[in-house]
Amino acid sequence: HLLGKDCPLERMVESQKLSSMILWGPPGCGKTTLAKLLAGSVKADFHSFSAIFSGVQDLKNLFELAKRNRQIGQETLLFVDEIHRFNKAQQDAFLPHVESGLITLIGATTENPSFEVINPLLSRSRVLVLEPLNKNEIVAILKHALKTEKAANRVTPAALDYLAELTD
């Protein structure tokens, strides 16, 4: 529902212009991986923060870097894992920079953003809901990975099923 022809992320990647977004989903559903893939698909300076280990000074430093990036025509993409762990004042620090386009924010959360992310930030971001992959989807991904590694014939279907079950 997020990827594929005429889906929001596909349009953003094709236009090389990401919108600020909040990725909401359970642990292990691919929020961080998706953010890294998006960063790799656009020409932006990518920075990743954990709301658990980062504070306002880290953000101020990044905003200064983003200003220097802007002067040379470089966009700045900021990924904040566990954005719901920032308090309201910390989340407020993003607002002027998201509004001005100085940064593009991708926040990841396992919590309902309607309750954990401040409304002004939500209104300037697109909320994308990620769902965990089911066993068949995981097996398909594993098969694809094994093909690219030329190891597909050495792994039994039972082993693939077992690996897929371990991911839950």
Features from the language model and the residues they span:
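Conserved Walker B
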Residues: 82-86, 90, 111
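Walker A/P-loop
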Residues: 11-49, 64-67, 95-96, 100
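Structural recognition of the conserved hydrophobic beta-strand(s) that form the central parallel beta-sheet
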Residues: 49, 79, 104-110, 129
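Conserved C-terminal "switch" segment of AAA+ ATPases
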Residues: 71, 127-168
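A short helix-turn-beta junction within AAA+ P-loop NTPase domains corresponding to the substrate/partner-engaging
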Residues: 44-47, 118-132
